[in-house]
Structures are given as structure tokens and as C-alpha cells.
Amino acid sequence: MISTNQFRNGSAIRVDGKRFTILSFQHVKPGKGHAFVRTRLRNMDTGAVIERTFRAGEKVESIRTDSRPMSFLYRDGDLYYFMDQETYEQVAIPEDVVGEAKDFITPNGEVSVLYADGEVVSVQPPAHVELEVVETDPGVRGDTATGGSKPATLETGLVVQVPLFVSVGDRVRVDTRTREYQTRV
């Protein structure tokens, strides 16, 4: 059990029998009345984000989480197979648990797999990944005066907006949090 004054961003807690990750929290002490803590929580199972208010000093159950580095091996149907880099154990993770991370996973690519209560909760890619452009329109000189962009399909199927000078076969760095083009590599 942890008190609301021990909340930290990224902490895992159990509220009403459901597992949540704390996205943000704010201690509020109004002029009248008792202090409280306003939080934004992400449900670990569904991904839904809710707002919840706790009384200051209220205790909630904490969840032990473990993050392990793993390498992506291959995909078979709707299962993604990863190898634990420490024990070399293979783990099959369903596509719905992998979620949006599938757009950034390449063979032998490293990810962080989050376990809560001994089961896989999420797959988190690194902050930036380098992917190859497999399809994009050719950029024509003089198309725009202020620099434009065009859609490009990357090797994982993700479509991002890239500058006109990027062509098929180029490798680009993409920010996995914003899903935006960063630079050509």
C-alpha cells in the first residue's frame, strides 16, 4: 500500500480491482476544505485514460512491475515472438498487447516489455527508431517555396510525413512517441 503523497509518474497502482499507471498527478490544497490529489491514470489492460481524485493521505495498493529488454524475433499470425536478452527465453505476445508498438518493431529490434503481476502488460519501443522508406512519391524540384512534405510508407507499414528530398531506400529516424519524422540517417 502506498499513500497518495508517494505517487510518482509511471507508478503502477490497483484501483477498484483494475491496474493503472499514473500518467500525471497534482496535489491540490484549496483554501477551504481538505487537500486532495488529482490524477490521470492509464488502464494497463485497455489503455483507456481516466481522471481520478484521491483524498490526501489515502492509501492505494501498489503493483510490482518489471521491465525487461527483449529482441523481436518474428511474427506468426497475431502472435509476436520476442527473446529475453538476459535468459534467452522466447515469449509469445498477442498483437493486442503489442498495440501501436508494432509500427516500430523490426526483426532483431530491441524493445522493453513491461510485466505486471507476472504477466505481459505492454511493449514499449525505444524513443527513436530508424526505418527504411519503401514507398513514396518522387519529390520534384520547385514544388514549393517554403519546404513541403509528402507521405512515405516505411518498412513496418507506418505512414509518416517526410520532406520532399527523402526518396525510396532512404533510412529515416522516427520519434515513436509522436510518430513523426525526425531526420534522414
Swiss-Prot record:
It comes from the Bacteria. One of its GO terms (cellular component) is cytoplasm. Pfam families: EFP, EFP_N, Elong-fact-P_C. Keywords: Cytoplasm, Elongation factor, Protein biosynthesis. CDD domains: S1_EF-P_repeat_1, S1_EF-P_repeat_2. Transmembrane segments: none annotated. GO terms for biological process: peptide biosynthetic process. It is found in: Cytoplasm. InterPro entries: Elong-fact-P_C (IPR015365), NA-bd_OB-fold (IPR012340), Rib_uL2_dom2 (IPR014722), Transl_elong_fac_P/YeiP (IPR020599), Transl_elong_KOW-like (IPR013185), Transl_elong_P/YeiP_cen (IPR001059), Transl_elong_P/YeiP_CS (IPR013852), Transl_elongation_fac_P (IPR011768). One of its GO terms (molecular function) is translation elongation factor activity. Its main location: cytoplasm. Pathway: Protein biosynthesis; polypeptide chain elongation. Belongs to the elongation factor P family. Involved in peptide bond synthesis. Stimulates efficient translation and peptide-bond synthesis on native or reconstituted 70S ribosomes in vitro. Probably functions indirectly by altering the affinity of the ribosome for aminoacyl-tRNA, thus increasing their reactivity as acceptors for peptidyl transferase. PANTHER family: ELONGATION FACTOR P, ELONGATION FACTOR P (EF-P) FAMILY PROTEIN. This is Elongation factor P. It comes from Rubrobacter xylanophilus (strain DSM 9941 / JCM 11954 / NBRC 16129 / PRD-1). The gene is efp.
